[in-house]
Amino acid sequence: MNKEQLEKMKNGKGFIAALDQSGGSTPKALKEYGVNEDQYSNEDEMFQLVHDMRTRVVTSPSFSPDKILGAILFEQTMDREVESKYTADYLADKGVVPFLKVDKGLAEEQNGVQLMKPIDNLDNLLDRANERHIFGTKMRSNILELNEQGIKDVVEQQFEVAKQIIAKGLVPIIEPEVNINAKDKAEIEKVLKAELKKGLDSLNADQLVMLKLTIPTEPNLYKELAEHPNVVRVVVLSGGYSREKANELLKDNAELIASFSRALASDLRADQSKEEFDKALGDAVESIYDASVNKN
């Protein structure tokens, strides 16, 4: 583990850019960027276009290490290059800590939750991540209803896989998303917090994780988790809120910082000039940084 990167993730001012839309969500991400499905004829072309979009983001002067602590990449992005360097090396050289999305998507809903599908060849993927100088990983589950067994299952699965990731020298971001429209959202979050605390308490002193959570209904609910000795940082997802709304809610949570994807890229378009693109990205970065650093 890179100690300098660990220090930046633990104490740096800023947020994490989530650039990890994968196979299923790529056409949608491209469409929002202004690239329609008739502009590519196969998956290779599609992934090349999305890599071009991400390259444009990370090479922009607005993508500044003074504001952006880390970036989460999709496996395809890890294996591609930006300005003749592998993406993670490009980011690290710029001062941005690279993470890799490792999950293979969500299983069918059961007990009010969606567990992660089995991650085949995880060891192999983690070895490749180490070769590519990746610092940490990210994996997402989804909680839709107040079901204690389901929430327990989500957290147990996350910690089980997290321990495998830690054993390879990487820092896992555990992401049990709570659907923002869940009818008992506040109650779900209390159960989730208790289960996460159990999971954290089961770790050895040298087993470090990060958490990526939905912004809680009750402000500062996760403060105790952020202060847990095994937690490097707690980050939040935008989860379907607009950027303005997500930022507003984030400001009410003292220890949390953003890890936004759609809310970061929502104003970026393929046909923008360099100046327009850099300004749109810069405005987004500025507002998300502000919500992550300057609290109410």
Curated annotation (Swiss-Prot):
The active site is at residues 175, 212. One of its GO terms (biological process) is glycolytic process. Keywords: Glycolysis, Lyase, Schiff base. GO terms for molecular function: fructose-bisphosphate aldolase activity. Pathway: Carbohydrate degradation; glycolysis; D-glyceraldehyde 3-phosphate and glycerone phosphate from D-glucose: step 4/4. It is an enzyme of class 4 (lyase). It catalyses: beta-D-fructose 1,6-bisphosphate = D-glyceraldehyde 3-phosphate + dihydroxyacetone phosphate. It holds the Pfam family Glycolytic. InterPro entries: Aldolase_TIM, FBA_I, FBA_I_Gram+-type. Its EC number is 4.1.2.13. Gene3D superfamilies: Aldolase class I (3.20.20.70). NCBIfam families: PRK05377.1. PANTHER family: FRUCTOSE-BISPHOSPHATE ALDOLASE. Belongs to the class I fructose-bisphosphate aldolase family. This is Fructose-bisphosphate aldolase class 1. The lineage of its organism: Bacteria, Bacillati, Bacillota, Bacilli, Bacillales. The gene is fda.
